[in-house]
C-alpha cells in the first residue's frame, strides 16, 4: 500500500490520540500515563484486525492472474530467439546454444535438437559453427568439440573422439623372453630338419650352349615350355636350304643362337622348379618335438594334422606358389595386356598422324607444281601473243609499201533467213493479185 493512501488514516489516529492525552489529569501517577499511551499507540498497529480497516484502505487488481501470457512450446517470444552461445564459448551438457523457429541451424558434432528446434549441448566443450559439404551441400551445423583448437568437420575416416575421463598414456610393452629350458634342465622343444643338398649353379657360356645344341640338338614348341630333341641334320638342312634359296649363313647362325637360348632358359626353369620342390619337401619334413609332462618328446596334434595339407587339398597335387603369387602373376599379365593395347593405340595414332602428314605434303607439292605449270602457260601465252602482234605489224608495213589493186565487188550470198523474209512479201503480193480479178468478175455479174 502506498503512503499516499495511508496519509488520512494516520492523521486521524494521531489526532485522536493527542486529544485523549491532553485530557489526562495531572494528579495521576506516571505509571497510569504510560499505560494510556500504550493503549493509544496500539490503535495504530496495521494488521488483519477489524480496528485497522481504515488504515489498510481499498485494494484494486493491477495485473491479470498468473498464466495469462502462457505460450505454446514452439511459439517462443521473438525477442528471445537467436544464438545464446558464441563460437569457442565453453558449454556444459544441457546448455542452450541456439533458439530458433524452424531449422536455420542443424545439430552437428556432440549436439542435440529439442522439440522446438532448440539446439542443446550434449557434452562439455567448446561451441563451433561450421559447414559440412560432404554431409549436406547447403546446411549449416553447430557442434561442440573437446579441444578448443579442433576444427569441424572432422575428416571422414578419422577415429571418433570421445571423452571417457581417462588420460592418454603410452603403453609400455615388455617383451618377455620365452623359456627354452624346463625346470629340470631339459629343452622344451627339439627341431629335426631334413637336410637337402643344393647343387651349385652351373655357369654356361654362349659358346658351350651353342656346342651343346649343335651336338644334341633341340627343338622348342610354339609355347616354349617343352623341348623336343632334334638332330643336327635338321638344323643344317634348314640352314643349307636357306642358303640355297638366296639366304645367307647369318640366318642359320641366328636360328642356332635362338635355339641355344631357349634350351638354356628351359634348363634353368626346370632346375628352379626342382629346387622349389625340394625346399617344400624339406619344410614339410621338418618336425618340432615338444617336451610332454611324462618327459617324452612328441609332435602336437595340430602339427600332425598339418602334415596332410590344408582342408580340401591332397598333398603333392597342388601347384608350387601361393595364392597371392597367382594373383600377382594374373595382375602382371593383365597389365602387360593392357599396356600392349595402349601401345598399339599409340602406334596407330602415330601412323595416322604420319599418313596425314604425308597427305598434306603431297597436297602442298601438287599445289606448287600446279602454280609452276600455270606460270609456264601464262609465259607461253604471252610469248605467242607477242609473236602474233609482231607478224601483224610486219604485214601492215608490207601492205603500206605495196598497195593492192582494186578488186571487183562480188556479191555475197544472202543468208537463208534474209531470203525467207524477202520471199514472204512476194507471196503476199501474188495472193493479192490473184484475188483482184475475182472481185471484178463478181461485180460484173451483179451489174
UniProtKB/Swiss-Prot annotation:
Highest taxon in the source lineage: Eukaryota
One MF annotation (Gene Ontology) recorded for this entry: structural constituent of ribosome
Any GO BP: translation
Any one Gene Ontology cellular component term annotated for this protein: mitochondrial large ribosomal subunit
Region: Disordered, residue numbers: 377-447
Compartment annotation: Mitochondrion
InterPro entries registered for this protein in UniProt: Ribosomal_bL27
A Pfam family matched in the record: Ribosomal_L27
Bias (Basic and acidic residues) ranges: 377-402, 409-447
SUPFAM superfamilies: Ribosomal L27 protein-like (SSF110324)
Keywords: Mitochondrion, Ribonucleoprotein, Ribosomal protein
Family as reported in the entry's similarity comment: Belongs to the bacterial ribosomal protein bL27 family.
Function (record text): Component of the mitochondrial ribosome (mitoribosome), a dedicated translation machinery responsible for the synthesis of mitochondrial genome-encoded proteins, including at least some of the essential transmembrane subunits of the mitochondrial respiratory chain. The mitoribosomes are attached to the mitochondrial inner membrane and translation products are cotranslationally integrated into the membrane.
Assembly and oligomerization: Component of the mitochondrial large ribosomal subunit (mt-LSU). Mature N.crassa 74S mitochondrial ribosomes consist of a small (37S) and a large (54S) subunit. The 37S small subunit contains a 16S ribosomal RNA (16S mt-rRNA) and 32 different proteins. The 54S large subunit contains a 23S rRNA (23S mt-rRNA) and 42 different proteins.
Protein name: Large ribosomal subunit protein bL27m
Annotated source species: Neurospora crassa (strain ATCC 24698 / 74-OR23-1A / CBS 708.71 / DSM 1257 / FGSC 987)
Gene from which this protein is expressed: mrp7
